[in-house]
Regions:
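Membrane-proximal intracellular helices of multi-pass ion channels
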Residues: 1-281
Length: 281
C-alpha cells in the first residue's frame, strides 16, 4: 500500500504520503535513495525520454538544461552538506548528514518530501533551499519553480547586454543547445519572470497584512513554496508543521498561488483576461 501511494505521489511530484511524518517515518537510506532517483527523473524534461527511446541517448545527455539542473543539484548538495557538517547542528554522522542534504536538494524542486526537519538547519542551508524552490526543475517536467531553462535564458540575456555595452557594434546571438533564441522567446521568458516577481511581491504584502504575527521567513517561504508547488516552507511552516493555523483567506490565496504555479503564470493570465473570452464568444 505504501509503495503504491509513494510511487504515484513521487512520479507526479505530489509529495503527500500515508502518514503525517511522510518519508521521515521510514528512516531508511534505501527507500530515500530509490525515491531520490525517481525524483530526479521527474525533474528532467520529458521530451528527453523520447530521445533515449529513439536511441539518441548521447544527444539527450548533451542537453544544456539537463546538465544545468544536475549541476545546480550537485552544488546545492555539497554546499548544504558542508554547511551542516561545519555548523554541527545535526547529531547525525557525516554520511547521514550528506544523505539528508542530497535528499532535500532534490526534493525541494520536486515532491517536497522531507527526510529530516530542515527548518532547524543553519540559515545558509535554508537559503539554498529557498533558491532551489525558486529555480525549480526542468521545463517540460512535473517539477515546480521558474524552471532551469528560463533562468538560463535570463542569464544569457544579461550576459549579452553586458557584452553589447562593451562592444556596441557587435551582433551577439543567444544560444541554448546550439540553437539561436529569437527575441519573441526572450520576451516570453522575461514576461514569465516579471509576472512571477510581481505576483510574489504583491502576495507577500497581502499575506503579511493578513498574518501580522508571522515573521519574514514565514511570509517569504510560504509564497515561494506555493508558487513553486513545493509543499513545505521554512520557519513556522516547515516539514514537520501543517498550514492549518493559517487564516481562511490566507489558505485561499495560497491555493490560488499553487494553481498559478502549476498551470504556468502566463497561461493563467491569458485564461483570465476578458479579451480571451470575448474572442471566443
Amino acid at each position: 500500500f505504501n509503495s503504491v501511494n509513494y510511487s504515484m505521489t513521487t512520479l507526479a511530484s505530489g509529495g503527500f504520503g500515508t502518514s503525517d511524518s511522510g518519508i521521515m517515518a521510514f528512516d531508511s537510506a534505501l527507500i530515500e535513495s530509490i525515491i531520490m532517483v525517481f525524483m530526479v527523473l521527474t525533474c528532467i524534461n520529458y521530451s528527453l525520454y523520447h530521445l533515449f527511446l529513439a536511441g539518441r541517448g548521447k544527444e539527450a545527455l548533451k542537453d544544456e538544461e539537463l546538465r544545468g539542473y544536475l549541476l545546480i543539484i550537485l552544488i546545492a548538495w555539497l554546499a548544504m552538506g558542508f554547511n551542516l557538517v561545519r555548523s554541527g547542528v545535526s547529531d547525525d554522522g557525516f554520511f547521514e548528514t550528506m544523505r539528508h542534504a542530497a535528499f532535500q536538494a532534490i526534493s525541494i524542486s520536486s515532491t517536497g518530501y522531507s527526510s529530516t526537519d530542515f527548518s532547524k538547519w543553519p540559515v545558509f542551508s535554508q537559503f539554498v533551499l529557498l533558491l532551489l524552490m525558486i529555480v525549480g526543475a526542468s521545463a517540460g517536467s512535473t517539477g515546480g519553480g521558474l524552471k532551469v531553462l528560463r533562468i538560463r535564458v535570463a542569464f544569457e540575456l544579461a550576459k549579452r547586454e553586458v557584452l553589447r555595452i562593451i562592444q556596441p557594434k557587435k551582433v551577439i546571438a543567444m544560444r541554448v543547445n546550439e540553437d539561436v533564441i529569437d527575441e519573441d522567446q526572450v520576451f516570453i521568458v522575461l514576461g514569465m519572470i516579471s509576472a512571477w516577481l510581481v505576483l510574489s511581491m504583491s502576495s507577500m504584502l497581502f499575506i503579511s497584512f493578513l498574518e501580522p504575527q508571522w515573521n519574514m521567513d514565514d511570509v517569504l517561504s510560504v509564497v515561494v513554496s506555493s508558487l513553486g508547488n513545493t509543499g513545505p516552507a521554512l520557519g513556522s511552516y516547515g516539514p514537520t508543521s501543517t498550514w492549518s493555523s493559517m487564516s481562511d483567506l490566507t489558505l485561499f490565496w495560497t491555493s490560488i498561488l499553487m494553481w498559478f504555479g502549476r498551470l504556468e503564470l502566463l497561461t493563467v493570465l491569458v485564461l483570465l483576461h476578458p479579451r480571451t473570452w470575448k474572442d471566443i464568444s
